[in-house]
Each structure stands twice: as C-alpha cells, then as structure tokens.
C-alpha cells in the first residue's frame, strides 16, 4: 500500500538527490569559469563521458521505459522509492566521507544554488500533490534527467546579464584608468609563465619603487578581476600597474588591453594550452599577440625569443605593429637584447649570467625549481632595465624570491624523499621542463599527474611526448585520469618502459604504490604535476 508516510520518504529522497546533482553541476560550471566552450570540452574527456554514460543514468532510462509498459502502480512506486533511496544512501556516504563534490560558495554560487533549489522544491511539491500514477513517476525521472540541461540553460541565461554587468564594470574601470595619466601599465600574457613572471616582476619593481607598484592578485587574470583591481585597489599613490591577462578565446586580451592601455607588453610564451577553446594554434598566436598589437608607437614589447610560436607570429606581423621598441630575450641566441648563459642548475636553484646588448654582465641566482624560470627572469630584467634599474639591483631582488611565490615548490617528505608540488595547473611546456628537472635526483623518480585538458587535436601527440619524457627521466609514472593514458603509455614504449606507466585514481592506492617504490632508496623525488583531487595532495602533505 502507498501511504502518505512513504510518499514523504520518496519526496525527501528525491529532493536531496536533486540537491546533490545541483551541487555537482554548479561545481562543474564554476570550475570551467562559466565558459561554454570549456564546459563542453569537459565532456570529451573520460571523466566527462562518465557523467553521461554511467549506470545511474542507464537505470533512469530503463525505469522510464519500464513505466511505459507496467501498469502496476504499487510496484512502480516501490521501484522508484528504492532507486532514490539507494541514490540518497550513496550521497550520505559521500557526505560522511567528505567526498561530496561541491562548488566554492561565492555570492554568485549562493544565488544560483538558492534559485535552483527553489526550482527543484517547487517542481517536487507540484508533482507530489498530484495523483500517484505512471505520469507522476515518468515526470520524476524526466525532471531528474533534464535537470543538468535546465541548470545549464539558466546559467547561460543569467550569463547574458552577467556579461552586461561585466561590460559596465569594464567601462567604469576604463574611465577610472583614464584618470591616471601618469600610470605606467605593464601587461603580461602567454600560454604559460604569466603568474610567475608577474610575481617576479612585482618583487623586482617593489624593491625599487616600493608601494608605488600594484599588481593583479594571484591567478586573477580575467577581465572581471582586472577591472575590479582597478576599481577597488588602484589609487593616486600607484605609479606602476602590473596586469596578468589570460584568455580562452580571441578578442579577450584586446578587450582588456583597451581597458588598461599598457605601455609595456610582455609575452611569456605560446603553446597548445586551451587549443580546444581557441580552435587552432593560429588563433592562440593571434589571441596572445593582441597585447603586442595594442601597444602604441612609444610602447615597449618584450618577447620570449626562445619560443618558436612567438617567432613565427612575430615574423608574419612585424611590419604591421605600431610599437617600435621590441626587446628580445633568450637563453639560446646570444644576439638577443637580453641573454642568459653559463647555467648551473641544482635541485632548488639556478645560477646563470645575464648579458645585455650594451655588454653589461651580471650573475643571477634564482631559488626556484627548474631552468625554465630563467627566461621569466630575463623578461623581468628587460622590463626593469627599461624602468631605470640596473642588473645588480635586479639580480639582488630576484635572489630573494622563494619557490612558493611562483606556485611550484620543493618540500621534504622524509629523510630520503622530496616532493615537488606543481599542482596549480599544467601545460605541455611546464610538464616537459619539470620532468627534465627530475634527473638531478639519484634515487627513485616518480611523477603523479592527470592527463592535460583542452589540447584539442594536438592532445594525442603531446601525451605521447610526455610518455617519452617520463620514460627518459622517471622510474614510475602514475596517471590519474584515463583520457590519454594509452598515449602516454605508447610514448614510454619507445624506450621499452611502458610497464613503468600505470593508471590509478584512488589516493590511498597511489600513496601505497609510491611508498613501496621508494622504501629502499635514498635521494628520491616525487613530482605532483597539474590539478588533481585535494585528497591526493593532502595525503602527500601529511609528512611535509
């Protein structure tokens, strides 16, 4: 018999299961920064496909089809009740284990959560006050299946109003920026190295100009964050503004450049990062060069001349650029305006000489991990020289920077093992550089990383190259997502080391595998590369 108590139980189970689904999709949209192309690109990944093709969704469709033929209302009710009771049980277990996927509760997320919760509640109450029949059951399942689409539809609908708010914010920031006639703005963009270059430059310029220097906060590089920095933090005491500029599509860097009006533009490097959202490598090149193309004739462009994609694009458009002064920085070509040579790389520092075209030459020391930071230092040095600093001042300021300031840092795990935490984000250039750095350790070398995302058609080839690099430099590679695991493995096969590449996504299992690998050796190194579940990171941080 179906009684009111059982109907209330079903209502309770159904409502909480929808709240769980709501939390997940809000998390996913927030993770992808409410960017439709990034959101859709996620569903081409292994984990993204699992969101669609899984046992729970299969059972929902099966139950929906079953209802078309079954006229036994009591049986149908208990099937639906059992189904949602089990789903609620899984939700409560995840809640108890603190494994529940949820967004970071910002004002925007709180608004969306309350809106969608009201929507779910209203729909549930509407249904549950109707007659209990097969239409009732079918509507329950249909709403459940369609909820992700409803969430996405309304988020995109609200994004229209958000975009109007952003345009207004940019206009206000642009107007305020115009009031600061003597403000020197330095724009920094690139596929990689933006944040570290910004932090290095801020440290160097602050050593000379003190509180007159302002920068965008850590990892804030979208138009909204930059506009808010201008509106909320910029004041008449500031003489230099350093803005990190990021983008997932063409036109965004141009939009920010029109707002901040940079005099100096620094291009850190170009690679295939976000190829899926830009559409092509050429679009990435065009998008990143929007900063350089925005510079007026009296401006200064500072380029990473080690980067082939920058060279290629520059050669195509150099005659069309308005900016006249272009500074080339290189660790490879001695003819560059700012050049680095005589490298000595240790586990946690880099020593090298910096030479300029006018034959200034000074020793530099960076207490950072990996030779790839040298080019960042050259870009910073080139900029600081233009602002009246000398190489000795720049070298002294850079020597005071700690690895944690750049997001890639080294920690002691135990007496025999160290860990490199490089878990903010990963790109092809950074992964290769970090893997190459591991050769400085004599013991076991282990990398734990997910497959890289948003690389479009280049993804397979890039992951094969990563596999080769792991095989050359590591004793074990643990890949925690399945998307291009086989490509990584096939890359390692080139060196006959495909058995050294394994897949594991369970944090406890990963830790157990790593500990068994390093227990008999000294001078071991573990590299945690790229964004990964906090549970994995926290397990390795316990001993740190």
Model-inferred region functions:
Residues 201, 205, 226-230, 377-387, ...:
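Buried hydrophobic packing segments
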Residues 183, 267-418, 443-444, 464, ...:
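Acidic, Mg2+-coordinating active-site environments of NTP-dependent enzymes
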Residues 75-106, 203-237:
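Active-site phosphate/ATP/adenylate-binding loop shared across adenylate-forming ligases
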Residues 187, 214-216, 240-244, 301-303, ...:
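Short catalytic-loop micro-motif centered on adjacent basic/acidic residues
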Residues 65-75, 81, 117-129, 226-228, ...:
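Extended acidic/charged loop-beta regions that coordinate divalent cations
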């Amino acid at each position: 018999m179906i009684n009111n108590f059982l109907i209330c139980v079903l209502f309770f189970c159904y409502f909480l299961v929808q709240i769980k689904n709501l939390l997940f999709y809000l998390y996913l949209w927030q993770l992808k920064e409410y960017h439709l192309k990034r959101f859709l690109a996620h569903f081409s990944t292994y984990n993204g496909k699992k969101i669609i093709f899984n046992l729970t969704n299969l059972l929902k469709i099966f139950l929906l089809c079953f209802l078309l033929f079954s006229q036994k209302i009591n049986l149908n009710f208990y099937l639906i009740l059992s189904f949602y009771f089990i789903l609620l049980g899984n939700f409560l277990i995840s809640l108890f284990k603190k494994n529940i996927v949820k967004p970071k509760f910002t004002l925007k997320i709180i608004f969306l959560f309350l809106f969608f919760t009201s929507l779910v509640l209203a729909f549930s109450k509407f249904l549950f006050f109707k007659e209990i029949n097969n239409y009732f059951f079918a509507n329950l399942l249909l709403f459940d299946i369609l909820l992700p689409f409803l969430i996405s539809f309304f988020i995109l609908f609200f994004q229209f109003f958000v975009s109007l708010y952003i345009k207004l914010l940019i206009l206000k920031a642009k107007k305020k920026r115009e009031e600061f006639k003597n403000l020197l703005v330095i724009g920094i963009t690139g596929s990689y190295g933006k944040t570290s270059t910004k932090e290095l430059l801020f440290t160097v310029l602050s050593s000379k100009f003190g509180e007159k220097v302002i920068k965008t906060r850590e990892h804030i590089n979208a138009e909204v964050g930059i506009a808010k920095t201008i509106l909320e933090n910029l004041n008449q005491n500031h003489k230099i503004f350093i803005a990190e500029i990021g983008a997932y599509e063409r036109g965004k860097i141009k939009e920010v450049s029109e707002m901040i009006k940079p005099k100096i533009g620094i291009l850190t490097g170009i690679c295939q990062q976000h190829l899926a959202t830009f559409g092509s490598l050429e679009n990435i090149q065009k998008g990143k060069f929007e900063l350089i193309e925005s510079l007026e004739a009296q401006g200064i462009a500072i380029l990473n001349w080690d980067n082939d994609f920058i060279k290629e694009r520059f050669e195509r458009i150099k005659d069309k650029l308005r900016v006249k002064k272009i500074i080339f920085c290189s660790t490879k070509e001695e003819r560059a305006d700012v050049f680095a040579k005589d490298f000595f790389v240790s586990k946690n520092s880099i020593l090298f000489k910096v030479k300029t075209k006018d034959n200034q030459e000074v020793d530099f020391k960076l207490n950072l991990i990996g030779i790839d930071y040298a080019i960042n230092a050259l870009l910073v040095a080139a900029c600081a020289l233009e602002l009246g600093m000398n190489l000795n001042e720049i070298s002294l300021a850079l020597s005071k920077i700690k690895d944690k300031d750049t997001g890639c840092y080294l920690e002691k795990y135990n007496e025999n093992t160290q860990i490199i935490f490089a878990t903010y984000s990963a790109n092809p250039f950074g992964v290769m550089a970090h893997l190459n750095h591991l050769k400085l350790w004599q013991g076991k070398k282990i990398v734990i990383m997910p497959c890289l995302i948003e690389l479009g058609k280049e993804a397979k080839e890039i992951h094969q190259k990563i596999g080769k690099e792991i095989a050359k430099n590591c004793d074990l590679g643990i890949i925690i997502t399945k998307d291009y695991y086989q490509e990584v493995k096939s890359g390692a096969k080139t060196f006959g080391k495909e058995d050294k590449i394994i897949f594991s996504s369970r944090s406890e299992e990963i830790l157990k595998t790593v500990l068994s690998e390093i227990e008999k050796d000294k001078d071991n190194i573990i590299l945690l590369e790229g964004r990964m579940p906090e549970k994995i990171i926290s397990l390795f941080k316990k001993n740190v």
